[in-house]
């Protein structure tokens, strides 16, 4: 039972009081503003960032000190200057600042756990989105079945609050949290769906949602590691975290005594689990009936413990060689490369067919063009168009914006097996930039290029990444040629591009 007590200590260590004084500090909201400003570096900075000012924050903190604004007028949204519909901006500010405050102790807990596991040196590389793909390249080629699962969202915010209660024993924190959510549900909008809240309070919602994912994964990993002692159909008795460990100790004794000969759930050493955002990939080498067990495990886990409805038909188990899945803006599938080898032994000749599996990762050109069309860089057919909303900026700013988007897309999609789709995206952005400059100067594209000679200038910028590679390696070297053909994964990408379309 010592290992179970160690696992329990992880939950107890998070039962601490939060740093409430930080909620009343101006620099916390400055951090929230800076986070959102740096987060949207790919397209345009959209949201309340442009409205941010310390004067508004000071006014907000003053109203937070005056508790009568939160309580006395709780039944009249027109009189309530803090929670009223017209002042929804205050709600956004406080949710961002509050999310930063509550993230602090959990980040410290994460750092301490990484130090204990002695992986703190590689933590920065593990944070990179691209670190997932080398793992898939190493593992998926040896597996046979894959299940592409979308993690369902809770339909009510109270479910997320209840999940948080298992980890944090702090009554004032939950009073404030429920007050905030209740006022949002009552006054700010008539739409009670969780999707509306996630759009208007993005960082706060991500904090609650990440807790939900962390809770279900902690149960999944714990049961996965101890699965040789458990029957899958009996897992539902563990879901009351307060009595989790006592029940498990009792069940191990019961299984050892009465059910040792009927254990139907055993370890699968070749099962792999990968998750990012709201999607997870489950892959296995063995027969699909084990995958079916895990499928029903997830369904019952979400339905019985988290009150989240999920249908079995939404989780499909497919042969890896016949199925492609979308992850982090890429289409991935395992391609079979067949070759025939002629072998001769004495006077007998044999033809041996060799099958080599290779993970094929490509850029989904149609969804990406759809995202570019939504951002007004091209039409739905992929034909570049000008962006008049940027015409008020200087030529240098316009070019810098387009080049920033192009570089980031090229940086993100350099792991593609086929680069032709990436070259087409670069062409769309390049021509859209030229059309925007021509629109600003009230000229045609041909006349603008002839007059300013911008074609060579843009060409130099759009090939900057290739120039860097050529600087590191000689132009006639085989290494440079392989880098142009092969995939390159960058371990400094911490979040996906805003134009990346991930279903």
Swiss-Prot record:
* Subcellular location field: Plastid, Chloroplast
Q: Which HAMAP family match?
A: MatK
An annotated GO BP = mRNA processing
Q: Does the keyword tRNA processing apply?
A: yes
Q: Which residues form the signal peptide?
A: none
Task: Report the domain of life of the source organism.
Answer: Eukaryota
* Keywords of this entry: Chloroplast, mRNA processing, Plastid, RNA-binding, tRNA processing
> What protein name does the entry list?
Maturase K
* InterPro entries in UniProt: Domain_X, Maturase_MatK, Maturase_MatK_N
A matching Pfam family? Intron_maturas2
- Keyword Acyltransferase annotated: no
Q: Which family does it belong to?
A: Belongs to the intron maturase 2 family. MatK subfamily.
* Disulphide bridges, residue numbers: none
Give any Gene Ontology cellular component.
chloroplast
GO MF, one example:
RNA binding
């Amino acid at each position: 039972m010592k290992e179970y007590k160690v696992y329990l200590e992880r939950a107890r260590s998070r039962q601490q009081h939060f740093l409430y004084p930080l909620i009343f500090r101006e620099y916390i909201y400055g951090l929230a503003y800076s986070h959102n400003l740096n987060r949207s570096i790919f397209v345009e900075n959209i949201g309340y960032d442009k409205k941010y000012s310390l004067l508004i924050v000071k006014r907000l903190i003053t109203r937070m000190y005056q508790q009568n604004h939160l309580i006395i007028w709780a039944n009249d949204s027109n009189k309530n200057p803090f929670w009223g519909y017209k002042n929804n901006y205050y709600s956004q500010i406080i949710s961002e600042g509050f999310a930063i405050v509550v993230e602090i102790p959990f980040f410290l807990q994460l750092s301490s756990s990484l130090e204990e596991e002695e992986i703190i040196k590689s933590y920065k590389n593990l944070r990179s989105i691209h670190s997932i793909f080398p793992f898939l390249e190493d593992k998926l080629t040896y597996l046979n079945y894959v299940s592409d699962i979308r993690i369902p969202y809770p339909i009510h915010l109270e479910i997320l609050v209840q999940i948080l209660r298992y980890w944090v024993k702090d009554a004032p924190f939950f009073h404030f949290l429920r007050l905030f959510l209740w006022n949002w549900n009552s006054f700010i909008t008539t739409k009670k769906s969780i999707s509306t809240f996630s759009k208007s309070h993005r960082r706060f919602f991500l904090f609650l949602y990440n807790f939900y994912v962390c809770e279900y994964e902690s149960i999944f990993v714990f049961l996965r590691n101890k699965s040789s002692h458990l029957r899958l159909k009996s897992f539902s008795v563990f879901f009351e975290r307060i009595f989790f460990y006592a029940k498990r100790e009792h069940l191990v004794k019961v299984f050892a005594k009465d059910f040792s000969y009927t254990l139907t759930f055993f370890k699968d050493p070749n099962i792999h689990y990968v998750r990012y955002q709201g999607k997870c990939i489950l892959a296995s080498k063995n027969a699909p009936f084990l995958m079916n067990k895990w499928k029903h495990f997830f369904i019952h886990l979400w339905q019985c413990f988290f009150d989240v409805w999920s249908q079995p038909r939404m989780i499909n188990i497919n042969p890896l060689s016949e199925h492609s899945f979308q992850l982090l803006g890429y289409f991935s599938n395992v391609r079979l490369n067949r070759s025939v080898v002629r072998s001769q032994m004495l006077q007998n000749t044999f033809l041996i067919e060799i099958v080599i599996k290779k993970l094929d990762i490509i850029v989904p050109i149609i969804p990406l063009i759809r995202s570019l069309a939504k951002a007004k860089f091209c039409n739905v057919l992929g034909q570049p168009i000008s962006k008049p909303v940027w015409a008020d900026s200087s030529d240098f700013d316009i070019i810098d914006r387009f080049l920033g988007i192009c570089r980031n897309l090229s940086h993100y999609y350099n792991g593609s097996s086929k680069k032709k789709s990436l070259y087409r995206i670069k062409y769309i952005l390049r021509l859209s930039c030229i059309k925007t400059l021509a629109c600003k100067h009230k000229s045609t594209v041909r006349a603008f290029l002839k007059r300013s000679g911008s074609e060579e200038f843009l060409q130099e910028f759009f090939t900057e990444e290739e120039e860097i590679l050529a600087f590191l390696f000689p132009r006639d070297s085989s290494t440079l040629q392989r880098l142009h053909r092969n995939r390159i994964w960058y371990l400094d990408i911490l979040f996906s591009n805003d134009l990346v379309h991930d279903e």
